[in-house]
């Protein structure tokens, strides 16, 4: 296919403010940029289509650098609790969902967040047992680092007062030693192993739903981690083969491989082509701030009895990174707390990646000046989730204390130190919409407050830097800085077309911009009617 795109504002992202009048695309690759007349004279032919932007604004395709694609699709299919603001509303929604289920199915929901309740108390089995005495119920907290289950689910998993905490996890127990139904991090696996395996059809349906939804948000690709959560690795692999690899639903899928899945993954035939590729080995170093399981150097201010959860001891973390090196892989490590981040840096220093390569540290929410300086000297890149600011403030201030907040969520500082940073959502934990992430990076305001302040305003990013996270950053973090993330000759023809110019509007209106078109490999996959 040959096409000349013109008639709008085309930002190349080669440098701030740089625009071109027209773009010529052939077989999914940009072959020329410049004036419309010059490109028409050089490339115009009966086979060359002319596509007018009708005044719309084109960018290199936005790419989410960290999400869980199949999980995002599940959120479209399952009980979504993320907008509910009380235990009663959650229980009512769960009861309504139960009416749609076969008799023996588990009831599974996604996204509860006690910080949205008037009284921020966790869900427990006592809440759930009142309405669900017999059917197993599993409700995932929004961070996916905690779950609330009822007694039937505990019984199905064989969890009792005598069950010890697994390494890297916590089974919360009451004063009498009885499980409360709340489980954190690796303890969740005890429940998840008892849940009947999902079908191939279910995973296929979830992935397709996710890709289609991402198109509507202007996303042309995503770096996803979901190969270890749906039974055998072959199940999600087949889903990616059916949906994306053959081009049925074009989407640039860069897949991380969880360390628990990597050996099985190696045994399977690898998918290839322009839409599916594999990247680093995924490891979790800690939990999340919402459940106080992110690993901190000092205890939580609002609960001095804990400083979080270390998912792997130092020796195991080092062994896992060494395993990745033996397989010729980099690592992508979830590290939210400062102590987790420090331990990951220590392990990477002992087992560095090959020259010219870098490891990925995901989230990097709570740091200190020493860690930031150290990270800037090391072969690492950071996956940032700007919308965490909108979700976590203001409650996170009481959780961490004001002193730690000075270098928390420090996106601008990290970028200023020359660290390669990319932008993502962590969907389904946060909304997948990149415009919400860009707006959060620019404004740093809470979505829980009307007309609230900008938190740590000195860390607000200019609009250009925020968009770079989702273009140049997402390309560079997977070594594609010379083929994606810019509109220039030789780059992939992946475009996000907006209804308005993000550089010319009030940043508070960024999320109101419409996606006019999403273009992948030169093909229009989504167009607003």
Curated annotation (Swiss-Prot):
Keyword Cell inner membrane: no
Record's keyword annotation contains Transmembrane helix: no
Domain of life: Bacteria
Gene3D superfamilies (UniProt xref): 3.10.310.70, Metal-dependent hydrolases (3.20.20.140), Urease, subunit C, domain 1 (2.30.40.10)
Pfam families named in the record: Amidohydro_3
Protein keywords: Hydrolase
UniProt GO MF annotations: hydrolase activity, acting on carbon-nitrogen (but not peptide) bonds
Enzyme Commission designation: 3.5.-.-
Entry's family note: Belongs to the metallo-dependent hydrolases superfamily.
Name of the molecule in the record: Putative amidohydrolase YtcJ
Gene that this polypeptide is encoded by: ytcJ
């Amino acid at each position: 296919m040959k096409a000349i795109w013109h008639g709008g504002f085309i930002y190349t992202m080669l440098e701030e403010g740089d625009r071109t009048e027209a773009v010529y695309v052939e077989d999914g690759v940009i072959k020329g940029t410049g004036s419309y007349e010059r490109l028409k004279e050089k490339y115009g032919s009966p086979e060359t289509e002319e596509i007018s932007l009708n005044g719309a604004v084109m960018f290199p395709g936005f790419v989410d650098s960290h999400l869980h694609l199949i999980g995002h699709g599940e959120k479209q299919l399952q009980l979504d609790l993320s907008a509910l603001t009380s235990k009663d509303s959650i229980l009512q929604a769960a009861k309504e969902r139960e009416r749609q289920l076969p008799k023996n199915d588990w009831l599974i929901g996604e996204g509860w967040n006690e910080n949205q309740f008037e009284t921020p108390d966790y869900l427990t089995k006592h809440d759930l047992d009142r309405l669900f005495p017999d059917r197993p119920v599993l409700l995932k907290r929004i961070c996916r680092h905690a779950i609330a289950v009822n007694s039937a689910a505990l019984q199905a998993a064989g969890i009792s007062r005598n069950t010890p905490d697994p390494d890297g996890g916590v089974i919360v127990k009451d004063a009498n030693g009885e499980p409360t139904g709340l489980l954190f991090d690796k303890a969740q696996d005890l429940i998840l192993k008892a849940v009947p395996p999902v079908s191939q059809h279910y995973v296929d349906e979830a992935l397709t739903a996710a890709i289609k939804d991402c198109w509507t948000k202007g996303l042309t690709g995503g770096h996803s981690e979901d190969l270890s959560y749906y039974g055998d690795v072959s199940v999600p692999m087949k889903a990616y083969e059916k949906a994306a690899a053959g081009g049925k639903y074009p989407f640039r899928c860069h897949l991380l491989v969880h360390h628990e899945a990597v050996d099985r993954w190696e045994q399977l035939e690898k998918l290839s082509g322009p839409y599916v590729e594999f990247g680093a080995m995924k490891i979790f170093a800690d939990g999340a701030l919402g459940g106080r399981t992110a690993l901190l150097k000092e205890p939580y201010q609002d609960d001095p009895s804990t400083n979080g959860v270390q998912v792997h001891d130092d020796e195991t973390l080092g062994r896992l990174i060494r395993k990745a090196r033996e397989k010729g892989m980099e690592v992508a490590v979830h590290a939210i707390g400062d102590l987790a981040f420090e331990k990951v840096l220590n392990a990477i220093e002992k087992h560095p990646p090959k020259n010219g390569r870098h490891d990925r540290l995901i989230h990097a929410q709570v740091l200190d000046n020493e860690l930031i300086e150290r990270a800037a000297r090391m072969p690492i890149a950071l996956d940032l989730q700007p919308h965490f600011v909108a979700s976590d403030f203001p409650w996170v201030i009481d959780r961490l204390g004001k002193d730690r907040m000075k270098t928390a969520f420090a996106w601008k500082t990290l970028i200023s130190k020359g660290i390669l940073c990319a932008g993502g959502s962590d969907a389904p934990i946060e909304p997948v919409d990149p415009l919400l992430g860009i707006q959060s990076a620019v404004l740093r305001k809470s979505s829980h407050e009307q007309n609230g302040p900008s938190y740590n305003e000195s860390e607000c990013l200019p609009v250009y830097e925020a968009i770079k996270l989702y273009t140049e950053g997402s390309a560079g973090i997977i070594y594609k800085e010379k083929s994606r993330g810019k509109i220039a000759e030789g780059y992939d023809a992946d475009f996000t077309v907006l209804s308005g110019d993000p550089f010319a509007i009030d940043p508070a209106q960024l999320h109101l911009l419409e996606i006019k078109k999403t273009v992948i490999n030169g093909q229009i996959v989504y167009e607003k009617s």
